[in-house]
Amino acid sequence: MKKWMIAMLLSAAALFVWVPLWMLLSASFMGSREMVHNLAPVLSEEVGYAHWPILPQYPTLKPYVELLLDAPEFFTMFWNSCKQVFPIVAGQIVIGAPAAWAFARFRFRGKGVLYALYIILMLMPFQVTMVSSYFVLDRLGLMNTVWAIILPGAVSTFPVFLMIRFFAAIPSALTEAASLDGAGAWQIFIHLGLPLGVPGILSAVVLGFLEYWNALEQPMTFLKDQTLWPLSLYLPRTGK
């Protein structure tokens, strides 16, 4: 395939991703009246189609002023999100990376059963485990604390499933050579597995961050004190 065709395909894909981001950015500079006018056919069931201009007709900084200056609780909720999400992502890597390495590089009894259990737990939606998680966290005295969000998130099985593929792709010749040079299992993991598995680790970090930064059900269920709420629960209320 010629280079110009590849460039056109990549440009089209980039445009497909860029357009929604640009729409969000332009909407942030629109006043409420202009936004309602653009979406009137959808909001009021009028005849016609909603339209979205490339640039706001009457740009304004009012939404930013209202959010950043007139709503000081925004910064509290932002800090709450950081306190919850960053420990979760760090815990997922600290716990998940060694587990993924073990699944990818070692043979042990019960490996298939344990891996199947990981897959089953990964496929279970939060609604299935919500009641049991509630009772466990309540018995541990963690309800209405940030740990009620951090601990279940840090032991998520999805990062393990994701990183296994990247660790398994590392050539066995490299680990065998390191073993012959006298490196132990832990040294091989630290000095060989982690550097070569960076793409998988970064993928797990990005997906884990997005998942828990936008989480709604977990904080809504486990956090009754609104001062502990993250941005994902606070922002939907700002337009009221």
Task: List the predicted regions and their residue ranges.
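A structural signal for multi-pass alpha-helical bundles of membrane permease subunits
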Residues: K2-K240
